[in-house]
């Protein structure tokens, strides 16, 4: 079930280095340029408490189950304190990661994915985005981009998921493809390997078609 509020809830998903954060922010800016009230947010995060949980999950070693429970707590806080209030005001909420990332990162198989979905339905009132865009890139390109990003940031603060090997990134890429098959009406996959401007144009095309708007490029 998608959200039943006035505004629209759009999420961006993808592997580390896919360009999803860049594309989500570009869409947010495009909405504002077109006179549409919008806010940008991210997971794990979006509220003071959720941001504290983010630092714990991204930089501390723990079991997948512990990660899952912390993320669910952060998401509940995020939905109740930020996402739903903004949607109720008629704003579009653009979010960098949501439930689909949890399905890919915090599960090992389809059975665990179903458990996560059951928790999501019971604890989070079956709250799903109106539309999800998965930005796909190959694991090798993802790892190249992670290295370039870190050089430009001039910092050693790679999180534990950035630091994983190519086999891990391949697993996440495959998981996103599988998750997209679970929600074909909600999820659209986009090739994230072309130039940023070309990917952004594809995002705008999809938003115009799916959300019945006419965003000017």
Swiss-Prot record:
Binding site for ATP: 14-21
Entry function: Phosphorylation of dTMP to form dTDP in both de novo and salvage pathways of dTTP synthesis.
Catalytic activity reported: dTMP + ATP = dTDP + ADP
Annotated PROSITE patterns: THYMIDYLATE_KINASE
UniProt protein name: Thymidylate kinase
Gene label: tmk
GO molecular function: ATP binding; dTMP kinase activity
Gene Ontology terms describing biological process: dTDP biosynthetic process; dTTP biosynthetic process; dUDP biosynthetic process
HAMAP family membership: Thymidylate_kinase
Record-stated family: Belongs to the thymidylate kinase family.
Keyword Transferase: yes
Cellular component GO terms held in the UniProt record: cytosol
Keywords, sorted A to Z: ATP-binding, Kinase, Nucleotide biosynthesis, Nucleotide-binding, Transferase
UniProt keyword Transferase, yes or no: yes
Its EC number(s): 2.7.4.9
């Amino acid at each position: 079930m998608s959200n039943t509020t006035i505004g629209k809830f759009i999420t961006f998903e993808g592997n580390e280095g896919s360009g999803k954060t860049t594309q989500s922010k570009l869409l947010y800016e495009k909405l504002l340029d077109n006179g549409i009230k919008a806010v940008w947010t991210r997971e794990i995060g979006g509220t003071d408490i959720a941001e504290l949980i983010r630092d714990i999950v991204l930089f501390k070693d723990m079991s997948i189950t512990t990660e899952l429970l912390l993320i669910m707590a952060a998401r509940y806080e995020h939905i109740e304190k930020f996402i739903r209030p903004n949607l109720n005001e008629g704003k579009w909420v653009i979010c960098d990661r949501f439930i689909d990332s949890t399905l890919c990162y915090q599960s090992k198989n389809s059975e665990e994915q179903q458990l996560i979905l059951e928790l999501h339905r019971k604890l989070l009132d079956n709250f799903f985005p109106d539309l999800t865009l998965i930005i796909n890139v190959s694991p090798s390109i993802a790892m190249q981009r992670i290295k370039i990003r870190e050089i430009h940031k001039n910092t050693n603060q790679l999180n534990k998921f950035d630091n994983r090997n190519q086999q891990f990134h391949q697993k996440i890429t495959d998981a996103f493809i599988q998750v997209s098959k679970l929600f074909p009406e909600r999820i659209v996959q986009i090739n994230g390997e072309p130039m940023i401007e070309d990917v952004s144009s594809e995002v705008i095309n999809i938003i115009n078609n799916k959300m019945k708007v006419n965003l000017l490029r």
